[in-house]
């Protein structure tokens, strides 16, 4: 039913004025308008007025009298975006049910009728999409939702491109809801699919309509709905026809995506057509001018190679066709060659422009990812360059990179077959007179390094010296790529061929001072990879002084952009080696000098804060003279960011600093705590329990929606509990425990796993040092619920930390685990599996001490298997200070002596047992 609402002219004019003033460059006018807008938002008809200005803003007679055409168009777009924002997030006026939406539902589609104004039609499409995602999903019985879908389909049938674009956005956000019943018990999915099929089958529709329709269908494929499955053969028939006949790039790109989705969800339907599909993709890669299409085709080949649904024997016949084309597309295109040749001059002396510096988020150190409390970066991509196969970290994803990535995965899967085809080709071109051929060849070698390592084995002793020579090549791209490729061979060098380490790493270190910035960047990244992959003893013995001296030179020589990469390398170096007095004298002064020159709002602080965090932690008490100044500034930045964040909830005009300022400040403070230990207590708590500001700030940070903020804050909390007087935390203990519980119970996002790990780790330290008393029942239940769950897959590092924390809780309250959910052989066995691999003696000892207290208190009616007893003895016999809890061990052995005599132990385990039986 059409809305009978009509706007009041004075309100329309008033709102139009506010919209214009909200965009004013004058802050006073803008702020006053924002305040007035907040009052306007309280009116029930607010959304209707915004919609009216969006769709009638250029035809309303009153508005035309007061505004120019340009102002009217700007106002329409502003009204549309405000309408969209008013339906989203914390500003969602729909959920409050206090605002009339009738006019919006009945008339918003009119914004698509006049498609001459692209801005207005695009904004209208966004509003319609938002209306579906925030209102119609929850109100599927509202007939206007179904009516709007049919109107969009009808408009598309008449050639209206904004309508199909709106449908495409709606399908992307809400496709799964169209499987459900809407008004009149109708399931819209069938009508939608039939319409999309009709649009893509008819060549008379525009390329935009055809491509967007395929895009709509692509949102349905992963859902595997019955309505699509029964139409799948029809879709395949149409899509194969399009692949043969439709030469439009927009359509072809979507066809490639369709095949990629089908490969993932219905590979059985593609197997008999793979010859044609692969040839189609190779044809696109080699012939189309639009690189986006070629990238999508190459993405299919990448998916084809990595799909768990495609056995190796099916992929193998295509290697001979795919690999040569991948190699050919790894050469820079003509335009890039011209640009690179024109910019080969030295540029290291030129200052970087701020706009040329890509924002770099801090390298988050997952400090507590292992239960032993040490750094554990297993879940991180240690080699930052692996995401950019050609090392071009400043350019967007392109065909060259996609080809290199595809060659990489194919070499990992079928190394022998790929090498047989690729290596003769590469050997022929290694000495090419054309620099871009040499560069692409070196890129290919790097791309194949991981998978083909053992097949390279015979040739690498000759190949490595050749690559080192290329560090002196006249052309900067060749030198740059050589740095990256040599780093890819670092595992081969470091594991079994250390005789190559000095001949390779010394020239790369020398290349740090290259006169071309791109080469500097590649060299420092390569050095960082070698540091990361090498044993600390190797770095300290062979390269410690040389790296310190080189870092010092680089700190003086590098410009802004490469300093960011350098900070990361120094941070990795500090994590790997125990820095000494020499390091403090060489690299600390320039770091502190740069730190002092940067403003609190400079984004260059992010990597520098992370770097200083690692350096402070490594230097330990030697960092003490600088600690007060460094801490005070980090604390000031942290407080400022948290304060602005809180104020922004009341005042949306406040610009909130990026979360990275909070994360890096927390990490630097934590680095000081780790490095200085108890000596840093007076920094954080200068008045003892009289000033707990840092804890109040941390409580705010632990409620931040960004996982990395909470992750860093839990790490700091754990270290405060570990190093400082426990009385400092007791006053806020209940609040911290509630937030720890919330993290463990409700953070089920895989990206948030490190935050969960740190929360559990912190809880373990708290329970070890502070008697949880009345909180122990609730906290143990939270831990056990996750430990014993069989409804989800628990990350191994999470399980490890859960196990350690159970042990630590058992130190003071073994009774809560000696009966109930934990008290059975299966859980004990699982506990041992998680804890036995720990290397940290202190952590493992405290975990086992608490665990044995629990076991010794458990009723003898609960039987323990020989396998579990064996695992306990295995765990106790290595990396454990048994003398600290010898009585608990003795009691356990006595209680299970009959079973122990029947178990076959290793010599080390027997030696351990003899300590308690002799």
Curated annotation (Swiss-Prot):
One of its GO terms (biological process) is mRNA transport. Pfam families: HEAT, HEAT_EZ. It comes from the Eukaryota. SUPFAM superfamilies: ARM repeat. Gene3D superfamilies: Leucine-rich Repeat Variant. It is found in: Cytoplasm; Nucleus, Nuclear pore complex; Nucleus. Residues 361-395 are annotated as: Disordered. Residues 372-393 have a biased composition (Acidic residues). One of its GO terms (cellular component) is cellular bud tip. HEAT repeats lie at residues 11-38, 43-92, 103-137, 145-181, 190-222, 235-263, 275-303, 320-413, 421-449, 461-488, 501-534, 542-577, 583-620, 628-678, 694-725, 777-814, 825-858, 867-900. Binds to nucleoporin FxFG but not PSFG repeat regions. Belongs to the importin beta family. Importin beta-2 subfamily. Functions in nuclear protein import as nuclear transport receptor. Serves as receptor for arginine/glycine-rich nuclear localization signals (rg-NLS) and PY-NLS in cargo substrates. Its predominant cargo substrate seems to be mRNA-binding proteins. Required for nuclear transport of NAB2, HRP1/NAB4 and TFG2. Mediates docking of the importin/substrate complex to the nuclear pore complex (NPC) through binding to repeat-containing nucleoporins. The complex is subsequently translocated through the pore by an energy requiring, Ran-dependent mechanism. This is Importin subunit beta-2. The gene is KAP104.
